[in-house]
């Protein structure tokens, strides 16, 4: 009878351990996602700045060609 009782008790304990792990990991995952988003936004700003500089240079080239 004890084996059945322990068998019933252990899945409940396993579930509670899983939820504890999830509750501990979710703030970490959220923080990592925020860091990744910030890094991607910074890279996007850099790419936009480079594209703008390229566009300005191409306009200058066109201006000099017309002279």
UniProtKB/Swiss-Prot annotation:
* Source taxon at top rank: Viruses
Give the record's family classification. Answer: Belongs to the rhabdoviruses C protein family.
- What role does this protein play? Seems to stimulates transcription by the viral polymerase. May play a role in viral pathogenesis or transmission by insects vectors.
Q: What else is known?
A: The P gene has two overlapping open reading frames. One encodes the P protein and the other the C'/C proteins.
**Name the record gives this protein:** Protein C'
Annotated organism of origin: Vesicular stomatitis Indiana virus (strain 94GUB Central America) (VSIV)
